[in-house]
């Protein structure tokens, strides 16, 4: 009994200590990346190159995903609003749901799946091949040279894709409302801007910035600390996608509560 109790106690301790240690290591890694960025220990050309590749890889998936979301919201919204004779309010619903929430969240999730996994795989392969150690031996900061450009690429690309996702998602709803349900174009556009202002667009882009930094740090952290050969790289890629999606949703709730919780 005492041995079983000891095993149970150790398991409980591990369940608490291991996550806390992981959070601490991630925080230290993020701090190192921030210091390297402020000291300009990174290549602008590399950041731009990564941003270009990331944007091209994620452009079509973002558009192809957000458009049907907007269309589905349009179909369901018209079905509900028609019960009250208020179908003209569909564009107001679209603008709030997509611009405030779905646009930045879906853009970040797809970038995490497409670009974050790629960054984790690249850095994981470098770690396994000891290329990161070789960079340090050459008196070059591996965090500044390999991590910071990728994180900055995420911070740059996710807000841009968020703006695109907002526009494409609203257009998906427009196609349904005007093309399928014959809603007047002027009515749709008038109510589109009724509940959305500059603050909402700013909030959407701000979410994109935060999500981009979060995904970039998670992806580079998992890849940078990969171990165990090819299997370890695979785990790093899988963890990147899972943790990124999880924290995007949690942080989105926090940001939405802070930005819109007072009824703004």
Per-region residue spans from a language model:
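Short, membrane-interfacial amphipathic segments enriched in basic
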Residues: 2-47, 222-227
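Active-site cofactor/substrate anionic-group-binding motifs, chiefly glycine-
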Residues: 50-106, 110
